[in-house]
């Protein structure tokens, strides 16, 4: 009768050693990740996967590996890692959010929308998913659904600047220009030092051919954030509308030097 008992004790001891080793590797991998030692962190996480390939928490390790691959620009590998993680645990919200964000980055809006919707099916008040799904609905001109998501988000977080800014942009697109401007005026009062608000409002003034008001807002945004390439993109567009070609070109070149996408500045 002693042999089965001894075997059970040996099994329990091995299991404890394995679990301890797994936890040590995960902790080390996270420390390496925080120190930006990406290659070492990935190797450590993969070693942890080898120690215990069946544990459900491996879903998070695949998330970390995917994050590392994404930072290296290995987008397809990152998507594959997220997929494996979701195969292990299909309801891990952080994994779904990572994949949704990467799909959005790769302009695969349909799959990004599907992942954000799945997150909201699991957690209806998940604020990141609400914001980006509202953005995607706006891009698809599904203003009714976009408004529902933005309204829900603003109710959850009344001081969420990005949500309120998104709602103002939506109202402008949805032929509610007065409401949009009122919302932007309110945001400028609440967040007077945030350049993004003045850039959006300046853009709306520009679309209405209210050039002096547009220039005032854009110039103020530049004062607030002189290294923000979006400021010079906006002023370049203003100068184009005013037929000041040399000034428009100079601002376009400066925006590119600061990191703007050149495709946004084509004639």
What do these predicted regions represent?
Residues 34-35, 68-71, 105-106, 139-140, ...:
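Register position in tetratricopeptide repeats
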Residues 53-56, 90, 124, 158, ...:
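Short coil turns that delineate tetratricopeptide repeat
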